[in-house]
Structure formats: structure tokens, C-alpha cells
Amino acid sequence: MSNVYDILKERGYIKQLTHEEEIRELLGKEKISFYIGFDPTADSLHVGHFLQMMVMAHMQKAGHRPIALVGGGTGMIGDPTGKTDMRKMMTKEQIEYNCNCFKKQLAKIIDFSEDKAIMVNNADWLLNLNYIEFLREIGVHFSVNKMLTAECFKSRLEKGLSFLEFNYMLMQGYDFLELNRKYNCVMELGGDDQWSNILAGVDLIRRKESKSAYGMTFTLLTNSEGKKMGKTESGALWLDPEKTSPYEFYQYWRNVADADVEKCLRLITFLPMDEVRRLSSLEGAEINEAKRVLAFEVTKLIHGEEEAQKAKVAAEALFGGNVKDLGNMPTAYIDKDDLNNSLVDLLAKCEILPSKSEARRLIKQGGLYVNDEKVTDINLVLTEEHVTEDGIMIRRGKKNFNRIVVE
């Protein structure tokens, strides 16, 4: 079996690592336990977590054991990384519910049977810490001068950084130490924005335990313009089908820019690299084949083959003009009483768009269509005249479709 390090390197996941030669040798000759942390601030994972899941799956396929650490304890503080404001603190009940949702989603591509992967909650050890003991055992190993040079803190110093958040790096470092002691976890993985926190944990284990520990970060999923992928007009692209339907999920990947196809095929599918290279070499109209494969493969991973097939059929029916096969399109249901209300109100009420202001903005920009007719009047009222045999068809931009059915 080839070394998983080489697989991760070839597919373009790896951004930074602490000890390159040692890590490659370790992954080639031993089966290790490693961990990735998940911040339970929502009840669903989103596309921003997708790379972490893929790396975990590649590592597990090579015989290594993933530990999914949910931050039930740190989530009650909030990670300052990449944030300009202090996060809202969450209740234990919210965090526990979110953790359960995460495990169901992770289990779609990670095997949790027979301890092949485990999920742990850092609340188990953080919430009962003795503050004095923690300062004496852990705090003594952290230099404030060094911490202040970390990017996650530098960007917050001018606007204000609470002592609560300043402790986050110590907590994350302590997580790694606890996992090392309990599960012989020797490596922490994460997005490149976690580099400073990962280094802190590696250094803590080497100081406290006089043992080797390693860290690796991977690239963030960005498009050719450097912007994070996974954002839509309706907000984040969620992995929960109740928040982002399989059809919308499929359509997002079907419509990525030509320049992003190769990167997405490498990073978020398990297609062999020879097939990735073949699909990525297609040009002109043929690149659509690669986009269809990408959309199907990614949707299959998250929602299963049946839902991926339904989304594919719905998308092809739409572009082929066959509106009889659109049962899998995102559909909102309203009462007859809801007619004779403004389009803007209904779009917000049906959650087709996140707000009335977003609906108005789209109309002003000429990007909203009802039954394939451009909407030019912000005050347009939907009436029975707009209801066709298949409902009211809403199009946002060129390729985002929804249907409103009157019951």
C-alpha cells in the first residue's frame, strides 16, 4: 500500500507540517492515531469542513485511526481564529445536540465501527479543570510574547481580545496533550488557519511528555480567485439535507468555474488521479462532463447514490426543458391565502432567499425570474395568474432554480 503522505501530497492537501521527513516515515511504517477538531457552533457541518473529512477518510483507508474532537468545552469560549468579534457562548445542551448531528454526517465517509474511528468531546476534561493546577502544569509552558505573534491574536489586538479568548490556544494545546495521554494520539491535523494552535500542542507534548508529536495543516477550499468555496446566495452550503437540499448541493458543484474543476476533483472526490487528470484536461463544452462527474461524486459522498442520481436527473431535466421531471427540485409549499402577497415577502418566508433585502437586491440587479420572466418590479405581487401546472418557477441568476407549489 502506498504511503498516505504521498497520496495527500499528490492530491494537493498538505500546506504546512512540523517535521516533514519524520511524518512521511511515520505514516509509512506505523498505524497512528491522529485528531482533527470540530467547533460545534452549528447543528450541521458545511463545505468548509469537507476537506477535513476527506483527509480523515484518506488516512483511515491507509490504516490510521481518526479521532474527531468536538469542542464542547472550547465551544463555550469561542475560537478567535479568523474572527473579528467575540463569539456568542453556547449552552451545554446546544453543544451536545450539535455534536450528535456532526457524528451522523462524519459517519457518511468515516467508519466508526469497532473503534476504527472515535469521537470525543473536550468538555469531558476541560469543564472540571482546577484553574490553579492548570496554570502550574500548562500555563508555565506558554510564552505570552510568543502567543502575541500568532496571526489569530495579532489581528484582534487593535479591536480588543478578551482574556477568555486568549486562553483558547492553551485549551487546544491541552486537548492534544490529553488525547496523547489517553489514546496515544501523535498528530493533529487542521486547516491552515489553525497552524499557530497546532504548533502550541506539538510543543506542549514535546515539553511535558518528552515524546514526539506532529502537526499538519491542509489548504482551505478556495476558488481560482482565492475566495472560500461553499457560499451561496442563501448562505453556507450545509451538509444537512434539511438546510441545503441534495439538488442545491449538486447544482453548486455542477456550476463551479472551469478553473476550479481540477482542484475540486483532486480534493473532494476519491476518483483516481489518472481519472482526475483526464477529466481536467477536457476543454470547451466538454468540461461539462467533468462538472457533471464532480457534482455527482461529491453529492454521492454526502447524500448517498440515490439522492445524487435524483439530483442529476432533476438538473438534466431542467436544462433539457423537461419540467415533468422536476420533483427533486427544491420546493416550497404555500397556502392559497399566501397568494396576493409580494414576491419579496414570499421569497423570504419560503427561505428561498435569506432576507427581503437580499430579494430586493437581486431584483435590482436583474437576477430574479418568475416562470422564466425577469422581475423588474420590486413590488410585484404573486397571484393565481403566476401559478402554472407545475407551480411557480423561481430562477436566481442563470442556474439556481426553486419551485413554489400552492396547496
Swiss-Prot record:
Q: Which PROSITE patterns match?
A: AA_TRNA_LIGASE_I, S4
Q: What is its main location?
A: cytoplasm
Q: Does the keyword Transcription apply?
A: no
Q: Which reaction does it catalyse?
A: tRNA(Tyr) + L-tyrosine + ATP = L-tyrosyl-tRNA(Tyr) + AMP + diphosphate + H(+)
Keyword Ligase assigned to the entry: answer is yes
The UniProt keyword set, sorted, is: Aminoacyl-tRNA synthetase, ATP-binding, Cytoplasm, Ligase, Nucleotide-binding, Protein biosynthesis, RNA-binding
Pfam families given in the database record = SYY_C-terminal (PF22421), tRNA-synt_1b (PF00579)
Q: Which protein, by its recorded name, is this?
A: Tyrosine--tRNA ligase
